[in-house]
Amino acid sequence: MAACSRRGNSLVVLAIVLLGCLSALSNAKEEATKLGTVIGIDLGTTYSCVGVYKNGHVEIIANDQGNRITPSWVAFTDNERLIGEAAKNLAAVNPERTIFDVKRLIGRKFEDKEVQRDMKLVPYKIVSKDGKPYIQVKIKDGEVKVFSPEEISAMILTKMKETAEAFLGKTIKDAVVTVPAYFNDAQRQATKDAGVIAGLNVARIINEPTAAAIAYGLDKKGGEKNILVFDLGGGTFDVSILTIDNGVFEVLATNGDTHLGGEDFDQRIMEYFIKLIKKKHGKDISKDNRALGKLRREAERAKRSLSSQHQVRVEIESLFDGTDFSEPLTRARFEELNNDLFRKTMGPVKKAMDDAGLQKNQIDEIVLVGGSTRIPKVQQLLKDYFDGKEPSKGVNPDEAVAYGAAVQGGILSGEGGDETKDILLLDVAPLTLGIETVGGVMTKFIPRNTVIPTKKSQVFTTYQDQQTTVSIQVFEGERSLTKDCRNLGKFDLTGIPPAPRGTPQIEVTFEVDANGILNVKAEDKGTGKAEKITITNDKGRLSQEEIERMVREAEEFAEEDKKVKEKIDARNALETYVYNMKNQINDKDKLADKLESDEKEKIETATKEALEWLDDNQSAEKEDYDEKLKEVEAVCNPIITAVYQRSGGAPGGGASEEEDDSHDEL
């Protein structure tokens, strides 16, 4: 590193890049004119949720299974791609092709210790590509494909987008997507890229605890309040301390751990039972993906039950070698297994309190967010830390983040109305940003918890005589040496006129907009020459070409999904019609007593042949099912019409019944 900046006449090194932190002034009327309805998506490690601001309030939207949260799981079978419940339900029988916890990979490097640890715990294959973790999976017809974490996240975002579109009855292009407050620059940008691949304009990235604070404070009037948001989800943990004052949400401090959550608690339960099975049965199931899939499902179920019960029995049929598994698990044992992890959550709470400069008695409300905050021991630790203060039960921990994101969406689209017009978000950069100076020192430029949007300038000069280029290394982190911080990349400033060291004055300006997007401009004060600086691609971002390719592939998958659904619908239509016919000709209240014997025989023959054909043609195409339906209708409909005409009723029994019963079968 050969650059120095200067205050007065002294040389100092400089530079910086700003973290894609998130949210901003909400009165964005100029944005509202360009945006349609903006949905809010909580893209979670284990579950995702979508909401929309509509008719003066937030609607959290249920998926096609009727659930308001959707598992962040994707699975591939020989015939189709599954997302959500359908994928998770297949995990035990299709482990190597079922992908989950991808949020723990997004924006990370392959050699990150968290990635290396997770590789040993998941049944699917994680491989290195361009220094990033990719997921290798067999899709169909034996074809093996690698997906970036962004692509898998995009599939989940697409599911949430389609859920909203089904509810609203229109195409959605714009979304607010949430990220953990402690996500770094690369993780934020990767999340935004996932939105692009899903066909979404990510109008804003906002921090999860800030979104939850909006959900809590939207209808809170009156004086200033300090709130602490404790957000412990499936895979990540955040603590944010905010001041709320009549619609102004100002983040004072944030802290967290992007690799701590419910999945880790499940893993401890699994490890306990794996050891128990080895001890009792002499069987090691740690490499048996099917057994682990079943155990993972039951570990999560047991953990949830222990939030309201003191003991559960974990029972799994034929877990290994045809052996059934049945063991008790007490809440006390569960707490003992996870004691260190539960206590680990208190560290960020203390740091955030110190950074905010608040005493415990100055926190007015504690807001719990994320499913893992239902764990009694976690609540007890928090209560003890705050000298007996009870946490607020005012928000739904599963839905609060999507709720706040939907409010922000309503503001950006202009659909929020009077209820949201006074809301102002002042969020912060969670990590210190700085540059490397001589000796590998981390020179801080933007301290953590700086309110964004922000704009900072600094004057550079040269370190050597006749130097025409300055190389600037940018880092994020809290340590004093850059080797202990995360390298965000570097940029070169070229074309400096040759001069003695310390002579040139180059002003570099770092500006972060409301989306947390960084613009860097450099100007030679001597010549007036200015140029934009682009951070190099060191931080593992997808290139524009890669994103465009992934968008195309996502569209191809969507087209395939559509064809699969059309095929299923066509098969269901045929089955429904055939069974309706069978029921009608055997039901005395319908057609049984009105048919001539030869008419009944014709219908019975046609329906029997159709059912046999269905059994023999499981993988037929949509057109085949449509054609078969026409054949059966050609036999049955004229008979039904004749019967109704004979009895003086309106024709159409079969057809109208089909219309009545044409709902998708579960």
UniProtKB/Swiss-Prot annotation:
Renumbered residue ranges of the record's region Disordered: 644-666
Protein's cellular compartments: Endoplasmic reticulum lumen
Would the keyword Endoplasmic reticulum turn up in this protein's UniProt record?
yes
Assign the protein's first listed, main location to one coarse class. endoplasmic reticulum
Protein's organism: Solanum lycopersicum
Q: Where is the composition biased (Acidic residues)?
A: 656-666
NCBIfam families per UniProt: PRK00290.1
Q: Which UniProt keywords apply?
A: ATP-binding, Endoplasmic reticulum, Glycoprotein, Nucleotide-binding, Signal
| Residue positions the entry lists as glycosylated | N617
| InterPro entries (UniProt xref) | ATPase_NBD, BIP_NBD, Heat_shock_70_CS, HSP70_C_sf, HSP70_peptide-bd_sf, Hsp_70_fam
Any GO BP: protein refolding
The similarity comment for this entry is: Belongs to the heat shock protein 70 family.
| A GO MF label | protein folding chaperone
What is the protein name given in its UniProt record?
A: Luminal-binding protein
Prevents secretion from ER: where is this motif? 663-666
Q: Does the keyword Transcription regulation apply?
A: no
Q: Which CDD domains match?
A: ASKHA_NBD_HSP70_BiP
Record function comment: Probably plays a role in facilitating the assembly of multimeric protein complexes inside the ER.
Tell me where the signal peptide lies. Answer: 1-28
This entry carries the following GO cellular component terms, namely: cytoplasm; endoplasmic reticulum chaperone complex; endoplasmic reticulum lumen; membrane; nucleus
